[in-house]
């Protein structure tokens, strides 16, 4: 892989579609390798905008606006970081030959909604998953639940992230509200939902899976140590690495992750979500990009998930080794403000082996993720305690 000088005619140009906190870290990782980065998001001053060479705010589902920007910037790589994209245009762009979509257009199209990836995993690859059905009306949702899925169950938009639009219901009386919430709260209103039966699992993990080129130029699949995480209302609030697992469960998790990522193809890092009970493992979801629970790797690994993604998409070798047990804990905005001020940062950083990342989002909401605390220790439990302590020490106030 040749890498040219940024801001010159020979620059290696990468365009990120989606420039939130995860995209911001990918941009920084790419720039450390001498790449010229163009950050795109739906709103101005997104976290990634603040560190990129150039930044744009457009509707990325609009094929005309997206085409104009791609033609203007002429990137070598396009790296989707969100689901709400016009993937048909991306397919046309990649077919033209000059620009490569990371990891592949197929991966982006299938993972942008839960129906595509669930049908691939369960029906084509025959991987174990929770019982599921798709519904395009309240009545068909009710029928799916009552004819086999049962209670409790989860209702989710076919296209959403960070828990948006998700509900857990335990009775027929909750179906109408869950349908309305899921059908309208996703990234794009699809008018369709997935209903999943509840699995009796011990814990859930994210297995960061990297497809990269080895020294001979062959695609090699590597696995980071499993990441455990705690969720509230479908959104991650805490993660840790490594998550203890039996050798058999870990092997099965890696087999599932390998099967899914090989089918999706391309180069890059994938966040594969799995449920685990004893030695049993079920596939849940996959993201063809760094995962929010993987932010723990900024402290626990020699190369974070963002470094690994940057290296892999550029065709460079990767090292997935764990440096030290680590944990992350979310820092919330706590209030609605466009002038948020963080206090207590010095106290948070006084916690042993701690660090924080403040994302720089231009607008805060009470439950919006505005930062993350990181910590390492001799063992995971101590790291988790340190990360939680550091996160709680960071306070917010309105600066107006």
UniProtKB/Swiss-Prot annotation:
Keyword Ligase belongs to the record: yes
Q: What is an example of a Pfam family matching this protein?
A: PurT_C
Give the main EC class: ligase
Q: Enumerate the Gene Ontology biological process terms.
A: 'de novo' IMP biosynthetic process
GO CC field: cytosol
* Gene Ontology molecular-function annotations: ATP binding; magnesium ion binding; phosphoribosylglycinamide formyltransferase 2 activity; phosphoribosylglycinamide formyltransferase activity
* Annotated function: Involved in the de novo purine biosynthesis. Catalyzes the transfer of formate to 5-phospho-ribosyl-glycinamide (GAR), producing 5-phospho-ribosyl-N-formylglycinamide (FGAR). Formate is provided by PurU via hydrolysis of 10-formyl-tetrahydrofolate.
Q: Which family does it belong to?
A: Belongs to the PurK/PurT family.
Tell me the subunit arrangement. Answer: Homodimer.
Q: What is this protein called?
A: Formate-dependent phosphoribosylglycinamide formyltransferase
| UniProt source species | Methylobacillus flagellatus (strain ATCC 51484 / DSM 6875 / VKM B-1610 / KT)
């Amino acid at each position: 892989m040749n890498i040219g000088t940024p801001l010159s005619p020979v620059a290696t140009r990468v365009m990120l579609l989606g420039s939130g906190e995860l995209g911001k870290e990918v941009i920084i990782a790419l720039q450390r390798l001498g790449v010229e980065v163009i950050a795109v998001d739906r709103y101005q001053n997104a976290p990634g905008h603040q560190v990129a060479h150039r930044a744009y705010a457009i509707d990325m589902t609009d094929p005309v606006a997206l085409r104009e920007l791609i033609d203007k910037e002429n990137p070598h790589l396009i790296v989707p970081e969100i689901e709400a994209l016009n993937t048909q245009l991306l397919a046309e762009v990649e077919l033209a030959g000059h620009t490569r979509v990371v990891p592949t257009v197929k991966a982006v199209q299938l993972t942008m909604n839960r129906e595509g990836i669930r049908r691939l995993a369960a029906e084509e690859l025959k991987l174990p998953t929770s019982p599921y059905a798709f519904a395009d009306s309240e009545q068909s949702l009710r029928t799916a639940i009552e004819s086999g899925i049962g209670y409790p169950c989860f209702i989710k938009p076919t296209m959403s992230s960070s828990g948006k639009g998700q509900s857990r219901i335990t009775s027929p009386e909750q179906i109408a509200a869950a349908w309305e919430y899921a059908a309208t709260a996703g990234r794009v209103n699809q008018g369709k939902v997935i209903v999943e039966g509840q699995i009796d699992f011990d814990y859930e993990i994210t297995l960061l899976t990297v497809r990269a080129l080895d020294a001979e130029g062959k695609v090699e699949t590597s696995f980071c140590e499993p990441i455990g995480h705690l969720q509230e209302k479908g959104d991650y609030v805490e993660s840790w690495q490594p998550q203890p697992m039996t050798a058999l469960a870990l092997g099965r998790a890696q087999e599932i992750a390998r099967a899914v990522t090989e089918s999706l193809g391309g180069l890059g890092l994938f966040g594969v979500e799995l449920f685990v009970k004893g030695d049993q493992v079920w596939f849940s979801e996959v993201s063809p990009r760094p995962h929010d629970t993987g932010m723990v790797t900024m402290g626990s690994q020699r190369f974070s998930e963002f470094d690994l993604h940057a290296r892999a998409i550029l065709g460079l070798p990767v090292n997935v080794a764990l440096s030290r047990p680590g944990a992350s804990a979310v820092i919330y905005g706590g209030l609605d403000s466009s002038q948020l001020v963080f206090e207590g940062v010095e106290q948070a950083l006084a916690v042993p082996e701690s660090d924080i990342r403040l994302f720089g989002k231009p607008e805060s909401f009470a439950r919006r993720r505005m930062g993350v605390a990181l910590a390492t220790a001799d063992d995971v439990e101590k790291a988790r305690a340190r990360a939680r302590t550091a996160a709680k020490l960071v306070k917010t106030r309105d600066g107006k």
